[in-house]
Amino acid sequence: MNEEKKKRKLEERRIKEVNASLKYISSSAQKKLGILAVQEQDNVFFCEDKRYKKVYTVRPAILQNKKYELIKALCDTFHNRIRFTQVLKNSGDKIGSYMFMTVNFEAGTYYEARKEVEEFENKIQIEITSILHIDIQPCTLDNLLSYMVLNYSGKMQQFDIGRLFSSKETLNFGDNCKDAGNGKFILNGNNDNCGIVCVGKGYPHDMPEMTTLFEKEQATYLVCIDFQSYDADDKEIYRLALNSRYSNERTELDQQNVINMSYFLAVIKNDSEQLENMTDRIFDYYDKEQVLLMPGVGRTQEIFLSMSSLGMKDFHSMQNTNPRIISNLFM
């Protein structure tokens, strides 16, 4: 009995130590970044939506023709909400690309969240990446914060995570993004550093690859896709909700999995006149393929900050979809 009591006390102490390893950042940084606390050794964020998040780097070049297989495997294996953020820079002679995968974990304590993260990483390595030969690696906190600044400002600068804990530090993340109307925004108060945010609203069932725009038009693109697969119980709840909403008792969901998706596209140019001319071509391109794309009117700053922060500041607008549509929206 004494031995069991001793083991229980040791376990309780270990749980407390794990939970205490979460370091809360300054209140000013919390407001700017949407992050409440970090676990530096595990590279995990605790965010203002009360979710734990971990970010991974994905090498787009290795994906090649495996996009659909990856998305389908993630939807079949996990029920976490997952966000892919792809940044594409078309400079005319080449297209540069980098990509992140942000995974949401719901848990009451960090001890519970860490177990979920470990289970996720074991599964994705054994059941997905080792089979598809895709390289997905955890992103360190320093690198992640540097990429957040790059996505927002267009300038790469090394970020010292120690700045997050100082109340005297001033972070300007998000301050310089101004709504210019009709989904457009201006960065740093400069009309020559501007962009537009677009929101996906509808997709044809047999939608083709929607990536030729990125190859033809010189610009910087942020492609942001959230998706989540639901289990059998959640699927039935979703079906009943649809029936209630549309007063249709015959709604059936034939897919093995119910998958919801949110799609955002941001296009950034260095010239306001060029952006204006390109805007029509963007909507014409999607309209031609029967994809309903709308400017992010009224939520421009909120959406762009969510995109550039890799989902640390959360914004999404989900609708039913399938893995093929998701995979056809990024390169």
Language-model features, listed with the residues they occupy:
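Extended, folded cores of ATP/NTP-driven motor/assembly subunits in large transport
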Residues: 1-330
